[in-house]
Amino acid sequence: MSVNDQITHIGKTLSTTASAFLNYQKSNSNTQDVLTNNGPYKNLLSNTVNNASSTSYFYKRTEHGRFVKNASNTFEDIYSKTRRGDVFRNKFTDNKTCFRMLTYISDDLLNEIPTKEGLKSDADGKLLTEGGENENLRKNASKKETSLFQGFKSYLPIAELAIENTERLNYDTNGTSGTVGAKDVMSKTNERDEIHTELPNFQDSFLIPPGVETKKISSSYSPSALKSFSQTLVNSLEFLNIQKNSTLSEIRDIEVEVENLRQKKEKLLGKIANIEQNQLLLEDNLKQIDDRLDFLEEYGLEVIEANSDENAEDDGMSERKALKNDAIRNEGVTTESISSEASNLPPRRRQQLRDDNSLNRLGAFYSKSKKRHRKSFPTFQQLYEPGTKIGSIMSTHDDFLTCLDFDAPFGTLCTAGYLDHTVKIWDLSKQNKIGELAGHLATINCMQINRDYGTLVTGGRDAALKLWNLNLAQQLYQETQNLTSPTNHIDSPCVYTFEAHTDEVTALSLDPSFLVSGSQDRTIRQWDLRSGKCLQTIDLSFANVLTTSTNVDLSKSTLLTQRNERPSIGALQSFDAALATGTKDGVVRLWDLRSGKVIRTLKGHTDAITSLKFDSACLVTGSYDRTVRIWDLRTGLLNKFHAYSAPVLSLDLFQENAAVVVADEPSVQIYDSEKDESWSCVEQGNETSVSTVKYKENYMVEGRENGDVNIWAV
């Protein structure tokens, strides 16, 4: 084979291989079959092997996997070359031939590149047809496959721009056109990546082909010059079309990758959800075991472990049953005897006997052994985008929700509705009803959950405060649903009733050891949770506290007040010996519970305060004057305030200097005072106003006027 034949043969091999890989992108063939299924490539491979006389020729030229030089230099090892020009240098070639081999492919070879449809370029090698061709040639021209050379050439402007930006980066970095220092390699690499990412953006610059001038086009009288401009522009259009198709292909690849990542994320989210469901199940089982142990201890039903043999086990089981039956009989006798004995006592003595039993139960309930600590807390809500609706519970009550509270994300939710005397308990993970608390005689205004003891405190318009055992309430409700026990159960989920207020309870705050309540009777009372006693009473019947910003006659009873009436004490919160109250006159007062005196007043609201929350640094208040104000507790000064188009009905502390706000609108507003911006959680198409809200650990629950409850990630 002559030198020219070798050159031609190598050129055809390169062209055929490149075309095969380009066509592979538009076919569904397997990657391993790209070359083996290509006819022209197989023919060239066969000719190469035949011209080599025998495959053993290649093995003879190798030693330990590398080609060995010989005196004739007829076969070269490309791995042993230090310069690219030495690869094809031998006794048959010179420097010019090597340069041609490395840099030039003739138009004839480009025109012979096979395509998927078996089409070839025009004989003159033009990229686009011009005037004079028939319509079929025009259609075929648009269907031609892009060659590897055309793809390289179309990206030359982008490559030049990349080189220019890299040189500019190096110059801007160290003031010269040299290379970047080794210590700055990582940072400079990141900067280069950002520049390369922005390379395809041609919004600010339009590339005009060299040799084409717009002024000459409008003033030229030379047909040859105009035809030359036309050909250049046609070629440029073809190059731009190649770039566009390649970019579209990259976009499609990115979309596929994004979809794959989205599906992978959904699978991982489902996995985390299952894990947290299992954690909640195990937590519930642990709680049931603890409750069962307490039950056995309370009724004296503990049985010594039996021996390992069957007889001993049977004896133990029979003994357990006997003890249980005796305990039940004794309990029945005791209950009957107490009832008969109490019936013979005077009314005041009967009430005292009931109070003593209730106090004993309260003290036993708040013993240290009753305190529960969760082993794990849900974090699934943190994986949602802020403002994402997680779920909803429809029609929890017939009228608007007056208050709600929950213990933890995806945990237990308690709700109360207007003119509804019961509290309903819901499972936030399954979004179904799991319990009910009946005992109040009027609408329930406020509530708070203590998740350490599994309790709920409620305050209603019947002037009563009630402490509930949520775990027992759920067990009784489940037994009632399954009809596994009589309906006249001895136990009651109401652990204790705090009775001292003479008018409706409008606000409360639950501390680890104390309960603080505010009422329409213009008093604030502090209660001991272990004894049930009222430790102190703070009277708010002093000047200008309850006389402004209202037209309501306070001399009348408010047990049947209207829903829009301003409460005397709209909100309060306590922590240790600190107490903050918001009253009808729009003034926030900070109290020291040890002395029962006001230590600071915060004035700024012009109407009754409806809600407040504080932490170690700031205090957030909402009012009927349609504003939310954030106060600095250290200085007592107003930091920021934000105005709304409707009265603020409820709020909760989102984070420092930020709050979740309900302003009698269909959306919940999240106000960030540091950034001085507000964004909302709104459900499209739902025009029902929000009446109350609670937030904990990136998890928000809001109640609406139609009784619906929505759950959000924020």
Swiss-Prot record:
Residues 323-354 are annotated as: Disordered. It is a peripheral membrane protein. It is found in: Mitochondrion outer membrane. The keyword Lipid metabolism does not apply. Keywords: Coiled coil, Membrane, Mitochondrion, Mitochondrion outer membrane, Phosphoprotein, Repeat, WD repeat. Residues 332-343 have a biased composition (Polar residues). It comes from the Eukaryota. One of its GO terms (cellular component) is mitochondrial outer membrane. Residues 240-298 form a coiled coil. SUPFAM superfamilies: WD40 repeat-like (SSF50978). WD repeats lie at residues 396-436, 439-478, 500-539, 561-603, 604-642, 644-681, 685-714. The keyword Transport does not apply. Interacts with CAF4, DNM1 and FIS1, components of the mitochondrial fission machinery. Interacts via its N-terminal, coiled-coil extension (NTE) with FIS1, and via its WD repeats with DNM1. Involved in mitochondrial fission. Has a partially redundant function to CAF4 in acting as an adapter protein, binding to FIS1 on the mitochondrial outer membrane and recruiting the dynamin-like GTPase DNM1 to form mitochondrial fission complexes. Formation of these complexes is required to promote constriction and fission of the mitochondrial compartment at a late step in mitochondrial division. Belongs to the WD repeat MDV1/CAF4 family. This is Mitochondrial division protein 1. The lineage of its organism: Eukaryota, Fungi, Dikarya, Ascomycota, Saccharomycotina. The gene is MDV1.
